Curated annotation (Swiss-Prot):
EC numbers on record: 6.3.4.5
Stated name of the protein: Argininosuccinate synthase
InterPro entries: Arginosuc_syn_C (IPR048268), Arginosuc_syn_N (IPR048267), Arginosuc_synth (IPR001518), Arginosuc_synth_CS (IPR018223), Arginosuc_synth_type_1_subfam (IPR023434), AS_cat/multimer_dom_body (IPR024074), Rossmann-like_a/b/a_fold (IPR014729)
Principal location: cytoplasm
Sites where the protein binds ATP: 10-18, 37, 120
BP GO terms, sorted: argininosuccinate metabolic process; L-arginine biosynthetic process; urea cycle
Family indicated by similarity: Belongs to the argininosuccinate synthase family. Type 1 subfamily.
Pfam families: Arginosuc_syn_C (PF20979), Arginosuc_synth (PF00764)
Amino acids binding L-aspartate: 122, 126-127
Amino acid sequence: MSAPKKVVLAYSGGLDTSIILKWLQTEYGCEVVTFTADLGQGEELEPAREKAVMLGIKPENIFIEDVREEFVRDFVFPMFRANALYEGLYLLGTSIARPLIAKRLVEIAAQTGADAVAHGATGKGNDQVRFELTAYALDPAIKVIAPWREWDLTSRTKLLEFAEQNQIPIAKNKRGEAPFSVDANLLHTSSEGRVLENPGEEAPDYVYQRTVDPEKAPDAPEFVEIAFEKGDAVAINGEAMSPATILTKLNELGGKHGVGRLDLVENRFVGMKSRGIYETPGGTILLEAHRGIEQITLDSGAGHLKDSIMPRYAELIYNGFWYSPEREMLQALIDKSQEHVTGTVRVKLYKGFARTVARWSEHSLYSEKHVTFEEDAGAYDQKDAAGFIRLNALRLKLIATRNARVKG
């Protein structure tokens, strides 16, 4: 395969991706286009433009985009309709961001006439898979460059030497190795590596950046009401908001009350186990509220089927198959289930917990007259239960009779 002439790089403006940018220029002799996404990570992104210009990137080849609304509307919300949890715990904050970044890389490549895209994911992690599966799903002819799998800059010392040799500025706090690596977006903050690599030791307090220590959270609970339409949150405390604004507000409330902390050892797609500290305050509240509204609006058969496919759906997202036909098939089923998931949920926030305390909906299947302990005015004839039990017990009785006969 011939060397690429123009490459679109997923660029943060940080030291590592700046080194990658210069490496692409020197190793491939190619023109580089940079793409920097505002996913709600809380960083000022204009310095990325300045750094790219300093490294020789043409102004017209610098793309900095606010994709927060698209991220929440088209990726986070569809995933939350499924109540997706990887291995029963992880809310997939990193996993769900990668398809959007990779999609934009491919789109910008088409727009600028680039023949390759590049990312800064290492050869040990899941992100390399997520970026590349998305790229190939959207453009089978695209070339993907993964510098961490190609170069010989295998230590922090070598990276810093390369930076110095190529006049890449190194902030003082980057001279030493960071105690852990951080990835953040509007859904979560994840921390991994170094001081966190021993799963037998509790994570230091300074690792947590988005949530207060639950023990130090306010002593008084706070209540928040979240309104849903067809499975998606549309308002908080009666105020209609955009998807990204809703998640931002829930992050603020959850972080204040220490909601959404997770210390997890997970199974990476590439075969190893890794330990991560995740903070997902708004997402944890949203998941609790969505489950709450489904409790009264979703039929038991549909709900149980939906629950049974959730682990597979979550695994597909974790492993990078957002644009696969099987994920899209499951999404169609999940979205169908949400047609009546409309109503409001009240959630109590208190010292690390988010708990549904009330829910109501015009689409509710909950019938108080059927479940009441008082007189139900003939709504339910308890005698009907006898035949129901006899029919369901028939096969169990036949099995027991057979077993007794065989043993006898």
